[in-house]
């Protein structure tokens, strides 16, 4: 199996990606397991931040790297929280604090104006100086609920209602979520690119 460093310390992302990538013959190791600290996310887009993270992990480990930068974009908020999704309530905010802040911010927004979209950008670098990274983007439309429902997933999943499924992302099984989510879409594109590239 090809060893690849996953440029994240987010346990939810590690679980989700490692199981899917192992089926493809990739032995995924989280950067934290290799003693690599997080890259500074100075980009203004999901793509910029994913490339920064992948390049940092590849440079520090000498391994190929995969990085994920993802977040929630709420239409009525002009795309916020966007790249700041993980720290919407502050630098060391918990998922629950971020979720509560978003619900509070949207408290007066009518139900028909609560559309949102999860975005995920996955970047694969063969090495730290790779001039042609593979960049894949997936997006997943939904609606922000007024209260949390479900115990699965992580982040904003309990308040992200998926109309096609009739439930929140946190109420979906891992398999259901992987088949339709932003991360599942981006990963499928990445695996296709790796197969063909």
Curated annotation (Swiss-Prot):
Q: Where are the transmembrane segments?
A: none
On whether Zinc is a keyword of this UniProt record, the answer is no
The positions annotated for binding Mg(2+) are 40, 69
Its function?
Pyrophosphatase that catalyzes the hydrolysis of nucleoside triphosphates to their monophosphate derivatives, with a high preference for the non-canonical purine nucleotides XTP (xanthosine triphosphate), dITP (deoxyinosine triphosphate) and ITP. Seems to function as a house-cleaning enzyme that removes non-canonical purine nucleotides from the nucleotide pool, thus preventing their incorporation into DNA/RNA and avoiding chromosomal lesions.
Q: How is the cofactor bound?
A: Binds 1 Mg(2+) ion per subunit.
Catalytic residues at 69 (proton acceptor)
Q: Got a GO cellular component term for this one?
A: cytoplasm
Q: Name one GO biological process term.
A: purine nucleoside triphosphate catabolic process
Q: Which domain of life is it from?
A: Bacteria
Q: Which family does it belong to?
A: Belongs to the HAM1 NTPase family.
Residues at which substrate binds: 8-13, 70, 154-157, 177, 182-183
- Give an example GO molecular function: metal ion binding
Query: Which proteins does it associate with, and in what oligomeric form?
Result: Homodimer.
Q: Kindly give the PANTHER family that the UniProt entry links to this protein.
A: INOSINE TRIPHOSPHATE PYROPHOSPHATASE, INOSINE TRIPHOSPHATE PYROPHOSPHATASE/HAM1 PROTEIN
Q: What is this protein called?
A: dITP/XTP pyrophosphatase
Kindly report, in one word, the top-level EC class recorded for this enzyme: hydrolase
Recorded catalytic activity of this chain's protein: XTP + H2O = XMP + diphosphate + H(+); dITP + H2O = dIMP + diphosphate + H(+); ITP + H2O = IMP + diphosphate + H(+)
Q: Which organism is it from?
A: Salmonella typhimurium (strain LT2 / SGSC1412 / ATCC 700720)
Keywords of the record = Hydrolase, Magnesium, Metal-binding, Nucleotide metabolism, Nucleotide-binding
């Amino acid at each position: 199996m090809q060893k690849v460093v996953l440029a994240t310390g987010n346990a939810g992302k590690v679980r989700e990606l490692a199981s899917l990538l192992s089926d493809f013959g990739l032995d995924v190791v989280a950067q934290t397991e290799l003693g690599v600290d997080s890259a500074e996310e100075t980009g203004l887009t999901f793509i910029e931040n994913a490339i920064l993270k992948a390049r940092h992990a590849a440079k520090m480990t000498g391994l190929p790297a995969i990085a994920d930068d993802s977040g929630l974009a709420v239409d009525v908020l002009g795309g916020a929280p966007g790249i700041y999704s993980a720290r919407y309530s502050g630098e060391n905010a918990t998922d629950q604090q971020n979720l509560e802040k978003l619900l509070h911010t949207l408290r007066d927004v009518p139900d028909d104006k609560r559309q949102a979209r999860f975005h995920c950008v996955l970047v694969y670098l063969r090495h730290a100086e790779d001039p042609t990274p593979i960049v894949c983007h997936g997006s997943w439309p939904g609606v922000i609920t007024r209260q949390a429902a479900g115990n699965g997933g992580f982040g904003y999943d309990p308040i992200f209602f998926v109309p096609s499924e009739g439930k929140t992302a946190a109420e979906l099984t891992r398999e259901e979520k992987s088949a339709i989510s932003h991360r599942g879409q981006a990963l499928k594109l990445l695996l296709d690119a790796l197969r063909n590239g």
